[in-house]
Regions:
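Single conserved hydrophobic/aromatic residue that forms the stacking wall/gate
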Residues: 1-16
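A short, well-structured beta->alpha microelement
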Residues: 34-47, 62-65, 335-344, 501-523
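Polysaccharide-binding and catalytic clefts of secreted carbohydrate-active enzymes
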Residues: 95-353, 371
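Hydrophobic targeting/anchoring helices
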Residues: 16-17, 53, 70, 89-94, ...
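The substrate-binding groove and active-site-proximal loops of carbohydrate-active enzymes
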Residues: 32-40, 55-61, 197-216, 299-316, ...
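A glycine-rich, often tryptophan-bearing local segment used as a flexible ligand/cofactor-contacting loop or short
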Residues: 542-618
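Extracellular ligand-binding/catalytic regions of CAZymes and related secreted enzymes
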Residues: 246-249, 253-256, 430-462, 503-505, ...
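Catalytic domains of carbohydrate-active enzymes, especially glycoside hydrolases
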Residues: 29, 35, 41-76, 223-236, ...
Length: 748
């Protein structure tokens, strides 16, 4: 339930909030907790659906309006608020305060002693424009990519008329130019414009709220907006100041998308402040990063981590100023976790200081739900479920009902472990209303969501008596964010690793996210199993951290004394001292890099093991990892691909390890991982305290309310048996996708 918003001091405002809490579902368990979008051309249907679905909040969206006729409805009204766009007049008057992005040119090979590089080749000139206002010699960088050396500024010139940089070169060396460009079309507006085929909508310019004139203007504008919109209860900031990196090519296709990217959070004004704060000179290379733009898969440099820290401090402080303004008018402040979220870092040190009432984000999976629901420092969280009501899904050949079902099945697992306070939808409500059967599907989702809250009554679900830790270079700062390219988007290169977090998002474990510094400082006692998953040399596997003596010895000691270690893909990978997996002794496996082909490996499968006891179907390792072989004297191979291994367990002192060649999300792989974790922890007997026999089903227990949820994660009917304390307590036949509530009989 909604709690007291920050910044509301007088009795009248408190009473307003208490009244709204009742409407939001505090006294009506099977209504409320739902936000619906609306628009000017669907007023009557909005009211009908509000009543049908029990919605207690309405919102506008990008490209829609909140009709005046709905302002008197007895629900909360959300207004989407943009701090960086939708005011072209201001942006055009202050071109120097338009937002900027660091770009890197194509890599061009010199064939003589001079070379001209056209900066905007491959970029869309309606989105980006070279910054010619600030000194290129101060803020740009030309690099010889053959040697890695910076080309002196007196060895190149920018020709503004042609948009080219001319460089004195060494023949057959390769060169790039890193340069600043103005974002003259907001990337999200451009995306929506293209997706919805908006014809007559003006392109929305961006402006940088961090800069002095715009900063004051935006604050004054927000005050006036609050005064002009007394009926709006919740200001839904979408979002604050810096867009994640979303760059289009010259054919209006997405060229570079990094949901965690900081490349568009720069300007000379900001960078001069950073230099004073950091105490050293800024280089464009700290942002463009050889053309990788600090993808989250890259091991972050000290300079990039410094930049993130600085941006958090500044962004969160300025965001607080806007939130304080909203609170002064008796309204709530909600942040959308997406779009211009860069610098807020909800799991960073400064986020709680913003003083937000709520966070809302898009739920594309169990992982992305946990990314929202685990956030602290706000009064409530809200998830915008998929599909978004846009024409790219609600069209001929689209399957919005199937997408809604799949989205809900994944989200529901995570909700039962870490519940959102509210759910909602976005887009054009008319599309959803007109699609046969879709509203019925939404009604089912909303009913199940409310049932979860009704049965849990604000209590936590049962978890195993130990913690599981995900180990990577980002640690707790990027909880539930690892191995992702772009917010819940499937990639062939990542799905075999992403499945680990997706499985964990709905499993009965308390999950911590730890960094290599955490390991160096000593592994916390409550952690019983450490998981390392990812490709070699990425931030998620760990790269050079695996040749740090302290990291290796601390983990070896941890496992030797009874801990568990699970590796997926290329864990602990770094070619050094005759090993590729630096903890091959702990894992019982290594990868053949063709350096040891002369050494014979006598690997044989023996699949008689606790981990495989429930498993009937073929094992799925996704893309897998090739050429894995078992080695040592204490391993057991549970699955093989030809002469190489895919699933291996190993004993190491009093501890255990498990290696998976890959682990994409599936109900069966969730069961595999569940068993692997209990085995690695040496606590197999704990697994059947609460347990269901069918791998397509899962169980969540709320001990304090005496309620148990058994869910069917498949699109088929399933038969399952529920065990409590090792004894069969219920025999259940579940419909496709069903959630069944039963009473906990443990103490009866």
């Amino acid at each position: 339930d909604l709690r007291m918003s920050r910044g509301l001091g007088d009795v009248y405002k408190r009473q307003q909030l208490q009244d709204s809490t009742k409407v939001m579902g505090g006294n009506h368990a099977m209504t409320g907790r739902l936000t619906l979008p609306t628009d000017a051309d669907i007023i009557d249907e909005t009211i009908r659906l509000k009543n049908l679905l029990g919605a207690d909040a309405l919102r506008d969206c990008d490209g829609t309006e909140m009709p005046e006729e709905l302002l008197s409805e007895p629900v909360k009204k959300y207004a989407t608020y943009y701090t960086t766009r939708k005011d072209n007049e201001w942006a055009m008057k202050h071109p120097e305060e338009i937002q900027q992005e660091y770009l890197i040119s194509n890599r061009i090979t010199a064939r003589g002693e001079t070379l001209r590089i056209r900066l905007m080749e491959g970029f869309h000139t309606e989105q980006l424009k070279v910054n010619t206002l600030d000194d290129p010699k101060r803020w740009w960088e030309v690099i010889d990519r053959t040697t890695g050396e910076v080309v002196p500024t007196d060895a190149w010139e920018f020709d503004e008329a042609s948009g080219e940089v001319e460089i004195r070169t060494i023949p057959y060396h390769e060169y790039t130019v890193s340069f600043l460009a103005f974002l003259i079309w907001d990337p999200v507006h451009m995306y929506n414009f293209i997706t919805n085929d908006w014809k007559d909508t003006p392109h929305q310019l961006t402006y940088d709220v961090r800069q002095p004139k715009t900063r004051q203007y935006v604050k004054d504008k927000l005050r006036k907006w609050c005064e002009d919109n007394p009926h709006i209860d919740v200001v839904r900031f979408t979002t604050f100041f810096h867009q994640f990196t979303l760059t289009f090519d010259d054919k209006k296709r997405e060229k570079f998308v990094e949901w965690f990217g900081y490349s568009a959070s720069v300007s000379p004004y900001i960078l001069e402040q950073f230099e004073k704060w950091a105490g050293y000179k800024f280089r464009p290379e700290y942002i463009v990063d050889q053309g990788y733009h600090n993808s989250m898969f890259r091991v972050p440099s000290k300079q990039f981590l410094d930049f993130i820290e600085f941006q958090q401090i500044e962004v969160c402080a300025l965001a607080k100023e806007l939130v304080d303004i909203v609170h002064s008018y008796g309204k709530e402040a909600m942040m959308f976790l997406g779009d211009h979220w860069i610098g807020t870092e909800p799991y960073g040190k400064y986020f709680a200081g913003i003083g937000l009432d709520a966070v809302v984000g898009s739920v594309g999976s169990g992982v992305t739900l946990r990314m929202i629901s685990d956030i602290k420092g706000v009064d409530y969280t809200e998830g915008r479920l998929l599909p978004y009501f846009f024409p790219d899904v609600f069209c001929e050949g689209g399957d919005p009902i199937g997408e809604a079902r799949d989205n809900w099945r994944k989200a529901r697992r995570a909700l039962l472990r870490s519940p959102l306070d509210r759910i909602g939808y976005g887009g054009y409500l008319k599309l959803a209303s007109n699609w046969p059967g879709f509203i019925d599907e939404i009604q089912n989702v909303v009913t199940q969501f409310r049932e979860i809250h009704e049965n849990m009554q604000g209590t936590a679900s049962y978890v195993a008596p130990f913690k599981v830790a995900i180990l990577n270079c980002w640690g707790s700062q990027r909880r539930w964010m690892s191995n992702q390219v772009h917010h819940a988007i499937w990639h062939r290169e990542t799905y075999s690793a992403e499945g680990v977090l997706e499985c964990l998002s709905g499993m009965p474990f308390e999950v911590e996210f730890i960094s290599f510094d955490d390991v160096r400082n000593g592994i916390p006692e409550e952690i019983k199993v450490i998981i390392n998953v990812g490709d070699a040399y990425t931030a998620f596997s760990g790269a050079e951290n695996w040749i740090d003596e302290k990291v290796l010895t601390n983990i070896r000691r941890f496992v030797d004394q009874g801990g568990g270690f699970i590796g997926v893909g290329e864990p602990t990978a770094y070619q050094y001292q005759g090993r590729y997996f630096q903890l091959s002794d702990v894992l019982g496996v290594d990868r053949e890099m063709c350096f040891s082909l002369s050494t014979d490996k006598y690997n044989e499968k023996n699949d008689d093991h606790f981990i495989l006891e429930d498993i009937e179907g073929a094992l799925d390792f996704g893309e897998g990892t090739s050429r894995i072989y078992a080695q040592g004297g204490h391993y057991q191979i549970l699955a093989m691909d030809g002469e190489y291994s895919q699933l291996v367990v190993n004993e190491y002192g009093r501890g255990h390890s498990v290696y998976f060649a890959g682990l994409p999300y599936s109900p069966q792989n969730c069961r595999l991982l569940l068993r692997a974790i209990y085995y690695a922890a040496g606590m197999e007997q704990e697994m059947k305290r609460y347990y269901v026999t069918n791998v397509d089903t899962e169980v969540t227990v709320f001990q304090k309310t005496g309620k148990i949820a058994v869910i069917n994660n498949s699109a088929q009917a399933q038969h399952t048996e529920l065990y409590i304390k090792g004894k069969c307590a219920y025999v259940l036949d579940l419909k496709p996708g069903e959630m069944r509530w039963v009473d906990d009989m443990e103490d009866r």
